[in-house]
Amino acid sequence: MQVSGNLLNLFDRTIRFSQLTIEQGRIYQIDELGTERPGEPYLLPGFVDAHVHIESSLLTPAQFARLAVVHGTVATVSDPHEIGNVLGVAGVEYMIADGQRTPFKFCFGAPSCVPATTFETAGATIGVRDVRRLLGLKEIGYLAEMMNFPGVLHQDPDVMAKITLAKAFNKPIDGHAPGLRGDDAQRYIDAGMTTDHECFTYEEGLDKVQRGMNILIREGSAAKNFEALIPLLTEFPDKIMFCSDDKHPDSLIEGHINQLVRRALAKGHDLFKVLRAACLNPVLHYRLPVGLLREGDPADFIQVQDLQNFAVQQTYINGTLVAENGLSKVPDLRSEQVNRFDCQPKKPDDFAVMMDPAQNEPAIRVIEALDGQLITNSLSFAPSLVENRVVADASRDLLKITVVNRYQDAAPAVAFIKNFGLKKGALASSVGHDSHNIIAVGCDDESISRAVNLVIEARGGLSAVADSQAHLLPLPIAGLMTDVDGYTVAKQYTDLDRFAKDTLGSTLASPFMTLSFMALLVIPHLKLSDKGLFDGQSFQFTSVFTA
């Protein structure tokens, strides 16, 4: 097979009209036929998402691949710790096996923090022996994000044992240290962490990159750090990569890494520096089996019409055309439905918050959700009371939030949250990072109970209720994913998202994605686990009441 076009060489920063000869999935020969020819298509390496949780797309790897290739993505660096928290090592193996049914190049990591903390109930544990077993697999390319950065700084034995194993297997170690700066950041880096995708200010990113860390610029459905961090690309092009981290199917339909390429170019960044971040750096850092348009490389590349819009015309993986003009050629595959879900329906009274009538001038701690960020703030408000019950107050945008243990029957943990903007009803989800218990937010206990029970009855899913209306997107695989065609799921999710905004009143850009992170204790400041309200600064439980 032969393909011709203006070939971008990311190593010598040139564009020459060339002809590729492809044999047995590899580039056998590159013939340079002259200088760049305006009007002819351009050939460049495929895009790589340098850090993503496939599960957060709500799709199996096979279905994720179908959507991603349309946008020129040929590979991902994928941390399977979401399903790992539900099913353990078996979940990681499930992701590997499902991904191998497609030509897409998934590089999975060995989850380093399952469960993420000891302050929540997960469905499984991935210990040191499990990490050793996973790192020994050829499909496992790295030790996935070390979220327990306090454990690194204090040299927790289990944490250090996992890091030591990764070094012994000569596999990179991903970091995760939001807000860590200065000497502590240096100690974290010195321990072996090579990347961070959690920087949310330019100053934090600059501090870490100057200390030798690779910075992954994240733009997902909930966390959006592109605007703050993209200036780093100018001075540190060899240390920057692009990633989505968590991307819901509706936004994956719209675009992927190609969107970040367009945005960076629109800001005036150098073409080859941008493509280095989007294509080259992840392949080199993680030693991915992904071609970079050199003789002998796997024939992984994309064809675009121009270098401004980067509209992807064709995507090739191992010499096979997997997408053309917006249509995926990756097969629509069904997958095995594995799960772990064992809790009973709840009653409205289970979500009641009682106040001691003898308490003087009470106040409640309130989680402040921040649109476009995973971090939260801790606020304090006077409670709204009905017969010694603290209730949600939609007029002040003070809603109830709950986390319900899905692995065993237990009393729900209940607290209060601001900035969801709901005027009525409730949302619930079995996608609740990282342990994936059921998490819900709502305006009244009856609605919260209805939304939670829809998820319980389906053994996983996203739900929204108001008045007599009830909507559900089932997620039968680990309570996280579905193997339904990704385009169909994207429409279902879009309809659910619109209901949450137009009917319930949510003011967030991505209410379900934001909700899913309100139980992620390793991101400060105030979060909720199935065991109670958690202060991410002091790293301990705290009371709903402040006085």
Q: Where do the model's predicted regions map?
A:
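Active-site microenvironment of metallo-dependent hydrolases
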Residues: 1-18, 23, 31, 69-71, ...
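Active-site neighborhood of phospho(di)ester-bond hydrolases with catalytic His/Asp-centered motifs
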Residues: 44-51, 78-81, 109, 144, ...
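Divalent-metal coordination cores built from histidine and acidic residues
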Residues: 65-172, 472-474, 511
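Short, ordered loop/turn segments at secondary-structure junctions
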Residues: 80-83, 111-112, 148, 178-179, ...
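Histidine/acidic residue-rich metal-binding segments in metalloenzymes
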Residues: 91, 125-145, 151-216, 221-242, ...
